[in-house]
């Protein structure tokens, strides 16, 4: 199996895996492994490509665009999770110590005359 065939199978399996698996730490680890393997395979590709290899490369490039979109979706979901965690942390500390963030600006309004 040559490098383009390996790249083809790796990309195809990664696309199906990233689309069908919910976000998790394991998925992120697999994405890192995929990117490392993929970069090695791309470095080993030698350039006069046959017609079949060109077709495979075109398909790999279209799949790559889909993988990038899925990775952007994962990035957005991770960012929203982080924002939610920060909000929960702020609400939790506010609940534990409600008088912590009171500002004292020296203003006192007397209602009596």
UniProtKB/Swiss-Prot annotation:
Give the chief site where it resides.
Answer: cytoplasm
UniProt key word Chaperone: yes
Q: Which domain of life is it from?
A: Bacteria
Q: Which cysteines are joined by disulfide bonds?
A: none
Q: Which residues form a coiled coil?
A: 25-90
Q: Which GO terms describe its cellular component?
A: cytosol
Give the keywords, sorted.
Answer: Bacterial flagellum biogenesis, Chaperone, Coiled coil, Cytoplasm
Q: Can you say where in the cell this protein is located? A: Cytoplasm, Cytosol
Instruction: Keyword check for Transport, yes or no.
Output: no
Family affiliation: Belongs to the bacillales FliT family.
Quaternary structure note: Homodimer.
**Role:** May act as an export chaperone for the filament capping protein FliD.
Under what name is this protein listed? Flagellar protein FliT
């Amino acid at each position: 199996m040559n490098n383009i065939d390996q790249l083809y199978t790796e990309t195809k399996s990664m696309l199906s895996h990233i689309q069908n698996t919910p976000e998790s730490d394991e998925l992120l680890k697999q994405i890192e492994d995929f990117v490392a393997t993929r970069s090695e395979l791309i470095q080993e590709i030698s350039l006069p490509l046959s017609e079949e290899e060109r077709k495979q490369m075109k398909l790999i490039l279209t799949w790559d665009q889909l993988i990038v979109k899925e990775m952007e979706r994962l990035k957005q979901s991770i960012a929203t999770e982080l924002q939610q965690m920060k909000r929960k942390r702020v609400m939790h500390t506010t609940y534990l110590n409600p008088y912590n963030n009171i500002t004292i600006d020296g203003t006192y309004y007397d209602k009596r005359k």
